[in-house]
Amino acid sequence: MATTTLSSASKEVTIGFGHPFVMIGERINPTGRKILAAEMKDGDYSRVVADAIAQVEAGAQMLDVNAGIPLADEPAILAESIRRVQAVVDVPISIDSSIIEALESGLAAYQGRALVNSTTGETEVLERVLPLVKKYDAAVVAISNDETGISEDPNERFKVAKKIVEHAADYGIKPQDVVVDPLVMPIGAISQAGNQVFELVRKLRSELKVNTTCGASNVSFGLPQRNGINNAFLPMLIAAGMTSAIVNPLHPELVQAIRAGDVLTGVDEGCTTWISSYKEPAKEGDNPRVERRRRRRA
């Protein structure tokens, strides 16, 4: 089965079947965050740095970095954001942009083996992104839509994913370095959105043997109490074979749900990570043997 290895200057992370589910922190993204966007545009990266540290401390094994700000110098801002993040945390980065010049600027600044986020199945996009992926020996997120749009049929999305994997091979990019995004749609608008993704992830795993990722919170868009849906959705994705996702690790219940998914699928063997994360420390004066004697006397 495929394993996708990403790295920072000092640390490797493996995305793959049988490995812990990889949480890619989503917070360094100015979309919908007016204060962050204004700060980044003005050259203030203090919030970027704080978000990087907080997400890694919360359990993120990778970070997504996006600098998509209207009327700003995205290539320069993305490169500087990456430099600032790499100065304070040691996890690998997903370099997130739809602007080819920004992707190249980010890749040139990055120390390690990055994940490029992303390409679609559109021929023009493939021909611009894949040469960069090869040039910088990166891996790439493959979004399973093309010129025809997003199909509700998992089989059509599978065809797009297969097309991307085949095009990547033409550039010398191995299947294990293509991480497919099956596209999570809002379940409030498409009642079968969850089942569509589960079916497609299983098919991608069994037939293409590629790793997968997604923007998991898309599933709850427009609904109340979104965290409840997100927290249920992620273990189901893990059970279907999803190997990573872009998430907000600052929600402890979501991190716990992901770790529970690893436990229940046998990846967290012996529940080692679960126990080390959630075992309550013994209270001062606690003595299990004394407690057992007390119970016997009672």
Roles of regions detected by a PLM:
Residues M1-V179, M185-A298:
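Domain-level signal for soluble alpha/beta catalytic cores
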